[in-house]
Amino acid sequence: MAIERQAVQGLRRVQSTGGPSAASFATRQVGVQETSASGSRFLEDLVNAAGSLATVTTSILNQRVEDDKVRQYNRALTGLMPTEDATVGGARAHMLVSLQNDIIAQTMQLSDDAQRFDGDDSQWEDHVINARMAVQDRLWDTYPELRGDKESMRVVTNAFMEQQPKIFAARETAKLKQEAEARIKSMESRILLATRDVPGEAMGDALNQLQKEAMAMQITKQEFDALVSQLAANRAAIGDDSMIQGTKSLKDENGVSLYDRVGQLQTGEIQANRTWAAQNQVALFEKKDAAIKAFEAGQLNREQLLQVMQNHNEISGGTAWSDSEIKSLFDRQAKARATSAKLEDLVARGEHGSPLGLQDISKEDRKAYAGALVDAYTKLANDEITRTGATGEEAEAIRGRYEQMRYAKLGQQLIEDPIIKERYGSLMQLSSANLKDMKIEPEALQTIMRARDSIPEDARRAVMGDKEYAFAENYDLATRMGYTPGQAIEFAQNASRGDKLPGSVMKELNDEVDGVVSDVASGSWLTRGDNMSDMGRDLMLEEANQIARSMKVAGHNNDTIKRHLKSFLQNQYTQLSEGFFTQGVLVKGDVRTLGDTIGANQKDVPTVLRQYLDNHKQALLDASGGMEEGDLYFDVDSKRGMFTIRAGSGRVPVTPAMPLSEIKGQDLLKEHYEKAVKERDEAKKNFEANQMRMWGAGGYQSPAPEKTTAKTVGSRGIADFLMSPAFASGENLPSNFEFNYKRNNMDFYNYVAKTENGANVGFDRVAGVYTPYKDAHGQSVGYGHFLTEEEKKNGYITIGEDKVPFAPGQSQLTPERAMRLLEQDMKSHVPSTKDWAVPFDAMHPGVQRGLMDLSYNLGKDGIKNAPKAYAAFKAGKFTDGFIEMLSTASTEGKRSSGLLVRRAEAYNLAQSGGSVPKISEVETREDGSMYVKFSGSMSEAFVSKSILGKIGKDGWMEVYPPKAGALASGTKVGRIKL
């Protein structure tokens, strides 16, 4: 509000406390008496002078007032009171500024009051008047000298009038807002009532109807949407998301739902679900637990469980399943299934494995195997009890029978039973007070005694444990002596704690040991080849005495010691025989699986070891320090897969410890065989020459050699063949016999596995199992096994008689099983050779492998798609056939260097049994042509003329001629060495 000059005019002068005194400059009204014309001129001049003085004084005073107005105005603006010597004009100026501030504050207050005022217009007018009077009263209280001043009153009235439009507008706006709020409030109540207990699927229809009602009440869509959003968020805060679900049906003209347009609703849905989860933790836990159990039981697969988890997270706001929890569950289940598969393999190996069974597996696997047997036989017992409905003693009898079967299996595999160790520990804790009046055998003791009776005698120490078995034997001895169960247990406890042996006991024990060693060393009475040498007897006696003393200290009686010494020595000391009456090599250690370890038939082990000694005889004797050949023996550690050659009863090592793989069984057998053939042929030649000299050409006829088969030689061994009439008559090994057959087969399957899935696609490294992966033909698993529709439907693959699951999270397809599956697939792809010149079984193993590789890659009848090759195979011209197959190195009509390499490898596989040159290089050129190079000179004796003519003098042969655009995508140009 501007202060105008006219607003402060006409005021009387005010007394000033500074400057000229009021007495000196006070304004006076000078009255001039009328004078006669003849009056004194002096008096007139005097009066005129006084008037001039008054005019000057008035001007000065007016200027003083104006200055004071400005000064008081500035003081008011800075919040200061008027000065004590302010003029009336200055005081009014100060008052106007204060009035301006007060009026503005009062206007803002009235505008704010208007928003909350609930009276009528008359009451509002009274409220405004009262507010004005309050301002005016405060003004007069502050400036009492201006009270009643008309000009000041007019100024106050004008100030109020200037603010009146604002106050009126605020009142009208507030009235409109209150009306709108009333409509919104009414609609809010309507929404709350109309949507109470309405489920989510019906909420959308209810909200759409309410939206129509809102528009009829002059509520805009935006206002309605905001109201619904807020109410939905409020409900979500207490775990109810029904209204939020309904907002998904409220769509604008563009078809976008309110839910999608308002982020608050989306976060509100999550909050509602989380609140629900917090309020229903038990229910959520039950849902999760049921899902986990269903998954572990195989009722849900991985995809189904993920969908269940997604549903749980949707109803719980993402709190039910975290990423780490999901991964942990899948990893745990995958590991469990992989472990189960591994245990099944162990159990199967125990059922059908080598004579040594599971002695070469790790300690952890042995414990796992024992645990697996507990689970397996407990399940079998429970299944039979359920099936038969047995109860009470009948059910216990079934459990006892399966427990005995379990102990028998542990004994067969020499696996220590953890349950027996636990029972032994509890029995050793029984005090004399507990045992004093004990008349009945405790359950723990019954378990140990049942185990002892169920386990083969020579396996009891290994299965039960040395001290545990000694305890059982001593308890049995005490009961035979008439002790009560309590007394017998105490007797067995004391025997188990003994550690010193009297001299008389030692003498008796030594005599018993001498008898056992003599029995073992004597070998067979019919054939003397397996009788132990004197050095072997000395070695046995030394170790037998050590074992006997240890067992005696542990508490074993002499009968038990003798039985176990005999079993141990028979397994750990073997005098191999080379023929009925010829002693072979002495072996310290278990030889029952030595043949498998060194890659030879078990019957050929004596021949292999003898050939090894012959090959290194001089070096071994030089290192023995003067020992003889008969003093050398093999010290074999089957568990570690190591051996040492020692000399004499002093066990002097003449070689360092070496892996058993150093003994190349097949190579040594081949060397021995070739030597025997040479000796036989020379002897036969000399014999026939003598016969010719004695009887003439017509007097002697060489007998026709007897025939044998590769299968017979493989099962009975080379040594047996060398002693057979067939060999003596001049027959050599069959043409399709192969040294290192098992090793070569293993290498072949490993090669195919690497070729089919060298990157190990689909292998779950956490669980150690294979899962399906996609390839060009669909879904495969393991080493290129194509999943059939039936397998996909069943969820398992049949490998032999085993049904093996393969789905992610449930897979039990371990690498070992994947290799068995590959072997099964390879054999199933063997082409039919019914009308071939050479049946498949009569082919050399190398040719068999080459054909299996082709058929596995191309399909069982894929060879028929190459007519020239197929005709050659049928005619028995295998080299021609494999060379013709080189031109099938294409995929989808494009030439592939990778496939050409594989065809060349198949050719090389087929040549493993002969002297035909192999392919050493493959070349691909930019013009699309492809070539292979043979490592040696090809002869017409090996291939047909047509093929021989294609091979250059440098060994290179063109497989494909040049052709633009013929190479498959990704095919590399250049040479590849095989």
From Swiss-Prot:
Pfam families, sorted: Phage_lysozyme
Cellular localisation: Virion
Gene Ontology terms: cellular component: virion component
GO biological process: cell wall macromolecule catabolic process; defense response to bacterium; killing of cells of another organism; peptidoglycan catabolic process; symbiont entry into host; symbiont entry into host cell via disruption of host cell envelope; symbiont entry into host cell via disruption of host cell wall peptidoglycan; symbiont genome ejection through host cell envelope, short tail mechanism
Top-level taxon of origin: Viruses
Function text: Exolysin that catalyzes the cleavage of the host peptidoglycans during virus entry.
Name of this chain's protein: Peptidoglycan hydrolase gp36
